[in-house]
Regions:
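Claisen-condensing/thiolase-fold acyl-transfer catalytic domains that form or cleave C-C bonds
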Residues: 40-42, 67-71, 82, 93-201
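Condensing-enzyme catalytic core mediating Claisen C-C bond formation in acyl metabolism
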Residues: 1-79, 84, 121-128, 167-173, ...
Length: 201
């Protein structure tokens, strides 16, 4: 099932120019952050690099299948990023997309394989992390820009700060459509950009 559930949420991030230092985090919750003791070092997270994406249109017209519309743009971004930086997919602990959902994830992995890139072992999607699709019957997963914002802030950043993850390629995904373009039967182009987030040791 390609249908998704729209996520309502928001998050804000402060980006500074100073390197700063690591902070002592007291009374940390093992389940939340994965730290092993009561006093743990909370690492800073830095933006190590970015890749600007391009609009990709595969002619998808089904507004209930946004994962299929956005997956080609995510693939283009990931492949271009790895080529530009001279890296393998395994360089990242996780390659995280925004809201492709389970259907879009399969398409993305297949498209990347066709271009000689295997992300099957370390790809995750914020839309899939948002819900328990089996128990909540949420189809392909969550959709909307809130997926990227909330899951990054509440799930991935804590894992980077605790040291559980060292480096991720964060790829928020978007679909370019409006009620007018949908009613006129236009295709839905996709877009994705990439940000490398790295824990400062």
């Amino acid at each position: 099932m390609s249908a998704t559930w729209t996520v309502t949420g928001s998050a804000a991030f402060i980006v500074g120019s100073g390197a700063g230092g690591n902070e002592t985090q007291t009374g940390c919750d093992n389940e939340r952050t994965g730290c092993d003791n009561a006093d743990s070092i909370s690492k800073k997270v830095q933006i190590e690099g970015i890749t600007t994406g391009v609009v990709v249109d595969y002619g998808i017209k089904d507004a209930m299948n946004m994962g299929a519309a956005m997956a080609p743009a995510a693939c283009e971004l990931i492949v271009n990023h790895l080529s530009d930086f001279g890296r393998e997919a395994s360089y990242y602990d996780r390659i995280v997309t925004g809201d492709l959902g389970s259907v879009g994830q399969k398409i993305l992995i297949d498209l990347c394989r066709q271009k000689g890139v295997d992300i099957s072992k370390n790809h995750e999607d914020c839309g899939m992390k948002m819900f328990d699709a089996t128990n909540q019957n949420t189809g392909s997963g969550g959709s909307g820009c809130a997926c990227s914002a909330t899951v990054l802030s509440a799930y991935y950043l804590p894992k980077l700060r605790s040291g559980e993850l060292k480096r991720i390629l964060f790829v928020p995904t978007g679909a370019l459509l409006s009620p007018v373009s949908f009613n006129e039967g236009e295709s839905v182009p996709g877009i994705a950009h990439g940000v490398v987030l790295e824990a400062v040791m």
